[in-house]
């Protein structure tokens, strides 16, 4: 993969920095030394917009940049000439995309912890850092984003022109927050991560131990959605160039 000299790595820092710094800074003004549940409040404040919009937006750009590394100078044809199947190449590229998603989640977690520690110490809040809570929700964001990036990658593969793939993916991301409030959310991968954070917000405000996010029937449906888009991307990758 020719991503060593690309601008993808700096890109994945932008969204976490923007959303965490703004979210923690706006909420920290209301903190007092007696404030409870500080970390969950900061996390939900930061993750809500991030999960619905900034994380998907950044992954759309990463998809296009990964695909664009091979479109210049007939790089895709040179790659397809290698003794490796098209399916294997497409799977390899999707694995790279997944790795960048994982990297961005790590960046989000690290930036959030640093910003949160600064905010709590500044406002003299003595609440312990709930690292397991943060790891659980970051892992949840990562897993629920997998069907979404599978759909993004399939669209990137199907549409050769970056403008078309970016435009279509953006059009699918934008109504995610609306679809999340309907029964159709379960079949709409672009809102999965945002719906997860919305459920955590519901649990936080209701102060209940009963999670609003139900694994079933979400998990089987998400696996089917992921499988369909992944299979589409794998089978269609490089098909036009091989004709």
Task: Give the ranges of each region predicted by the language model.
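Transmembrane alpha-helical segments in integral membrane proteins
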Residues: 57-71, 76, 146-163, 223-239
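Secretory targeting signals
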Residues: 15-61, 91-158, 204-205, 209-219
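Terminal transmembrane helical anchor/hairpin motif
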Residues: 25-43, 166-243
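Helix-loop-helix units of permease transmembrane domains in multi-pass membrane transporters
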Residues: 66-98
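Transmembrane helix irregularities
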Residues: 3-5, 158-159, 179
